[in-house]
Design a protein with these regions (language model features):
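Conserved ABC transporter NBD signature motif
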Residues: 54-65, 69-70
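Pre-Walker A (P-loop) beta-loop-beta motif of ABC nucleotide-binding domains
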Residues: 14-29
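C-terminal coupling/interaction segments
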Residues: 236-282
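Catalytic Walker B motif of ABC-type/P-loop ATPase nucleotide-binding domains
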Residues: 147-151, 156
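Walker A (P-loop) phosphate-binding loop of ABC-type ATPase nucleotide-binding domains
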Residues: 32-37
Length: 282
């Protein structure tokens, strides 16, 4: 559905070098700190910024050959864009009908009613959660095949985030083959919906893994200096010096559980995996 190969973009104090793939029928997450390169990647995918090197293929077509007609199959949410705050939902309806030949007005209005969004109130007067719902609803209401969502849950409370994620789950079950690329710095959001995750740091992908594998096979080993010295390190991804000795990140939890029953092994959260990949030593 989407493939990026060696995408390179340079700014004065930042360089992006990114490769990733979103498979058909998959939800793929891009997670990283603010400023890690998520938004730059998304803008390059959509042709909103130029880039120095790399290949981007969307729905089987090179980006350079992607037409306005092809864009009908994309649903997009960007963190710094959307409809004018001076428009109402009633104003948006004819715009959507003109933009997208497959705009499902009845579905859109059904969701508007479900979320109790006022149709005659200016969007600038909506709450943060209401604005986010409008963005996502416009992305999913024209039978897109691929959603590209940059931080759609940013700034939302737990309830609003859960409601948005439920919309995305429904999108994935609507039509076979639908796919999503979604970014966030909130790991729990991506953990609950993504099939696989890419972790980006300072413009570079530092880890790609299936979400199930991250949650089942990754772990933190907590060992003192003596235990660390005697540890088989072939399955350690990162190590970090601590006051008690070392914390070590592995993707082979079972190996260490079987061969080192005396050491402390903790299930690593995605946040802990990210922290270790960034701050730990290889």
């Amino acid at each position: 559905m989407l493939k990026i190969e060696h995408l390179k973009k340079s700014y004065e104090n930042f360089s992006l070098d990114c490769s990733l793939e979103v498979k058909r029928g998959h939800v793929t997450g891009l997670i990283g700190q603010n400023g890690a390169g998520k938004s730059t990647t998304f803008k390059a995918i959509l042709g909103l910024i130029s880039y120095e090197h790399g290949d981007i293929t969307i729905l089987g077509k090179p980006l350079a050959q992607f037409t306005a007609k092809d864009k009908q199959d994309l649903g997009v949410v960007l963190s710094d864009s959307g409809f004018s705050g001076y428009l109402t939902i009633n104003d948006i309806l004819p715009i959507m009908e003109n933009l997208y030949k497959n705009f499902d007005k009845s579905f859109f209005l059904e969701q508007v009613e479900k979320f109790q969004l006022p149709c005659d109130k200016k969007i600038k007067d909506f709450s943060t959660g209401m604005k986010a719902k409008v963005k996502v609803l416009t992305a999913i209401s024209h039978h897109a095949k691929l959603l590209i969502l940059d931080e759609p849950t940013a700034g939302l409370d737990v309830i609003a985030r859960d409601e948005l994620l439920e919309l995305l789950r429904d999108f994935m079950t609507k039509e076979e083959g639908n796919s999503i690329l979604i970014s966030s710095h909130i790991s729990s959001d991506l953990e609950s919906i993504c099939d696989d995750l890419y972790m980006i740091h300072q413009g570079t992908i530092i880890l790609h893994e299936d979400t199930d594998v991250l949650l089942s096979d990754y772990a933190l080993l907590k060992v003192d200096d003596e235990a660390y010295a005697g540890l088989d390190k072939q399955y350690l991804l990162r190590s970090k010096k601590e006051s008690y000795g070392y914390s070590c990140l592995t993707n082979q939890k079972q190996y260490y559980a079987e061969n080192y029953p005396q050491i402390a092994i903790e299930k690593g959260t995605i946040d802990e995996v990210i922290t270790m990949m960034i701050r730990g030593a290889a």
